[in-house]
Amino acid sequence: MLGKKILGLPVAFALSLAGLVLLPAVRQNPRVSGVFLGAAAALCAWSALFSMQARSRRLALEVNLRKQHYVQACAQGSVLLYWGWHWPTVYESAHFILAQLLFAYAFDMLLCWSRRDSYILGFGPFPVIFSINLFLWFKPDWFYLQFLMIAVGFAAKEFLRWNKEGRRVHIFNPSSFPLAVFSLGLIATGASNITWGREIATTQFYPPHMYLMLFLIGLPGQYLFGVTLMTMSAVLTTYVFGLVYLATTGIYFFYDSYIPIAVFLGMHLLFTDPSTSPRTELGRILFGVLYGLSTVALYQLLGSAGMPTFYDKLLQVPLLNLSVKGLDWLARSRLLRAVSPEVIGRALAPHQRHLAFMSIWAIVFAGMNATQGVGDDHPGQWLPFWRHACREGRPYACPYLADLQVGYCRRGSGWACNEAGLLHVALSQSGEDLRRLDIAGAEEHFNQSCDRGIAAGCHNAVTLKNREGEFAAARPTIEDYPIILRGSKGEIRERGPSELYALACKQAWTEACADDPQKR
């Protein structure tokens, strides 16, 4: 398509963006409506200004549906659909995702035509927008930052380029770069609460068999683009570290998993962009190892600094993108050439090699799934593991257990309130948790437990007030189990007494095994 008429395309996208304010979900929030209209107006103004400046130019529009774009978009879209089925906020935010797509197309067109005469129209913005929305959303009152994040991503793709194997290509993935930049800004300003980042990282584990789902949706891209080695090396590096950490400390490094689901997602659909990753097979292995190790390091660094840890899979990707030339050079060096996978099976065609690596990855994943390395039943998500670890004096176990108990107390468990108070008292005496040095902080938990009908909570509130007597523990009631059995998977479906006792027994609540009427 040639001529000035194609300048109407970005305007059409901008007007479609403005038209979203007619939706009730947008109209009821004046700030969101203002952001949508403001973004649309800015795009229209840019288009008008550009139209006046480009009168003597012959602009072109080329349609090219690249396999890399639509395969990635299908995988990411599948995750959004499956995740949204179990966390309705995703579906409720569909108009926000649509707004970002409309903005991305208009912005990308105008930016490209500002620098050259041809624009390639395809599915390119889809994987960028879907990828960003799998990891970070700004809340409605701050949604203008979402548009700014998209603009930064496409600008980085257009302006930050280098020569790679004789071609002028972009350095950074257009979704991972703005994610890292804005993550740094949020950390620096302490403004993580204006995003859904924490909720995203938590709720992505809600759907059943999410690890298996991510494994399966990653297979087409691994076959077509040969990215298996990156994913497999990243997963294995993190998993092996977790095994060593467990053997050394007796607890799990990531607390409720060997590899958090959001990190596992990043290992499949974030850092594996074939355009911004190494070309050599050994380089891709090293790339994955570095991603796994850097995720571990960032999780520890952020956690120790009291910062949100959900940035652990985002911050390092641009630095890894900068390393790809060096990793490929290292992989081709005389030092490592002999151990490169390229020396094995040289007669195999590329897709045959991809299938071979995918087969190895499938065996590795099946083994991890069978040994609870991944899956829905990791013991670290349940209270009994942490109660046992706390009693054994494992590092960080008691403070983490206290946090879990406070969370269940807030959800309505009187037993958990009493346990949170008891552990608060113990931690105030041991000094292990700097947040719980004042014993008086246990009073609120005991009072909440008492208000919910736990006699031990009433007794402990009096004991704490008088500073004399012994504190008393209680047993979970049938009303507590729907709350304290939820783990990291969200609300449980079981509600009948027999089902609850059976589930509790499965999770190693020994008292539940004795209380189950069917086992008496």
Residue locations for each model-derived region?
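Loop-to-transmembrane alpha-helix initiation sites
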Residues: 29-39, 204-209, 253-261, 284-286, ...
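Membrane-interface helix-loop-helix junctions at boundaries between adjacent transmembrane segments
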Residues: 111-203
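Membrane-interface segments at or immediately adjacent to transmembrane helices
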Residues: 147, 367-434, 440-444, 448, ...
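Internal/C-terminal transmembrane anchor helices
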Residues: 347-373
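C-terminal ends of transmembrane helices
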Residues: 46-61, 104-117, 152-168, 215-225, ...
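Short helix-capping/linker turns of helical repeat alpha-solenoids
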Residues: 392-395, 405-406, 411-414, 420, ...
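Internal active-site segments that recognize and position negatively charged phosphoryl groups
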Residues: 178, 186-239, 243
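N-terminal signal-anchor module of multipass membrane proteins
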Residues: 2-113
